[in-house]
Amino acid sequence: MAAKDVQFGNEVRQKMVNGVNILANAVRVTLGPKGRNVVVDRAFGGPHITKDGVTVAKEIELKDKFENMGAQMVKEVASKTNDVAGDGTTTATVLAQSIVAEGMKYVTAGMNPTDLKRGIDKAVAALVEELKNIAKPCDTSKEIAQVGSISANSDEQVGAIIAEAMEKVGKEGVITVEDGKSLENELDVVEGMQFDRGYLSPYFINDAEKQIAALDNPFVLLFDKKISNIRDLLPVLEQVAKASRPLLIIAEDVEGEALATLVVNNIRGILKTVAVKAPGFGDRRKAMLQDIAILTGGVVISEEVGLSLEKATLDDLGQAKRIEIGKENTTIIDGFGDAAQIEARVAEIRQQIETATSDYDKEKLQERVAKLAGGVAVIKVGAATEVEMKEKKDRVEDALHATRAAVEEGVVAGGGVALLRARAALENLHTGNADQDAGVQIVLRAVESPLRQIVANAGGEPSVVVNKVLEGKGNYGYNAGSGEYGDMIEMGVLDPAKVTRSALQHAASIAGLMLTTDCMIAEIPEDKPAVPDMGGMGGMGGMM
């Protein structure tokens, strides 16, 4: 086991603070509408230009082990805020730096770090409660667009396209961000349910131009096992042929004789059918087949529930207005399912989301809700160069997370104003303990730091602006983008309450841990001897 370097007290705390400052100073320059760019070197390809706080934070590793520990702890603030709210990473980093810097002064002066932390926690709890009180719901497309624009560094086009996407697929809908092919941002909306399985044979294609198989008013057969014997399918195929309608077969797999017969029937025009594999794997496949059954008004034919393929009737089949099957995707448009049953299914999946523990499971369940409830929107980000594309995509993803957070918990005045107004909750907060009161004072000063940084990045004088904003009331603040004072909500400068709350809570949590740190342990790097040069090899004299 390698030897360890163990250090105590103020000296090691100072190293930790140095690490915090290096990381925070790199991140804080990106804050606000006039935030600067940070250029990050990549091992391969061109440099990455970004204004996204968490992207900058993730790139930083420091040489000194103790400084690096401080930097990594603040990186955790940015990452955690990003995971919970999807935005506000720079605000969280600025708050953490401010709380640590203020708190260290008190610790060095001999105050009890544990009481300071208790005071900080009490102040943050009061601020969070006040933020909930001053938040207003975010319902209209205009407000959603404003939140998106602010988060995307005042890019109004990004806000507008996100608002349009939410309008089309609903607030529960799935919105994904992809690389575009043109210079402009584009919105592509898939109505109905889409899953990532395509036709099993290209001979099913009937629209050569689009390279898809399009079925109008089809029946949908759902089976949870493989189909390889055509005899099992014949009774259903005969009933569908009599009805003179096309058929989509969704099964674990369709192979051999069964697939060949379907293809031949399709080519000869006897019966228009398309076969696709069922989406997902294992239990998720069963659940998704059930979703499709409810959406189309059919049942999943499964031996588990006593149904067999040869005894299936038209009543067991689902129906839809139109189904389009491509090479990799199948889209079911306007299923004939009962609206009440679909709603009940959505409610059931939402219940599962509440109890799900892993982010992956939550994401997959959320996708299922979206496919049943609305649809899927894809924002294709356009840019002139690949470097610009990456930077723009970062901002669009930030904006998307911010708008979702705004819909969830409402919005507050942006530009650091909400935190200043929430300070009112601390005026009457007395803990009855001098050290804890000092903790409250630390937070009281720290909540000014986001506004100060926004003003500094815009080239203004922070103290002058903070004093002027404090003289006002309500949503009165400073719009760094235009250099004007006024009502932030009316000017469209909004922040999601969830983002502001998460930033404050995570910053205070990590900063509190740092203040109560008294010992740090790091590995001592071993001095490995250099590898000796290779000696000359016999018989290679002519090459030396």
From Swiss-Prot:
The gene is groEL. GO terms for molecular function: ATP binding; ATP-dependent protein folding chaperone; isomerase activity; unfolded protein binding. This is Chaperonin GroEL. Together with its co-chaperonin GroES, plays an essential role in assisting protein folding. The GroEL-GroES system forms a nano-cage that allows encapsulation of the non-native substrate proteins and provides a physical environment optimized to promote and accelerate protein folding. ATP binds at residues 30-33, 51, 87-91, 415, 495. Its EC number is 5.6.1.7. Transmembrane segments: none annotated. It catalyses: ATP + H2O + a folded polypeptide = ADP + phosphate + an unfolded polypeptide. It comes from the Bacteria. InterPro entries: Chaperonin_Cpn60_CS, Cpn60/GroEL, Cpn60/GroEL/TCP-1, GroEL-like_apical_dom_sf, GROEL-like_equatorial_sf, TCP-1-like_intermed_sf. GO terms for cellular component: cytoplasm.
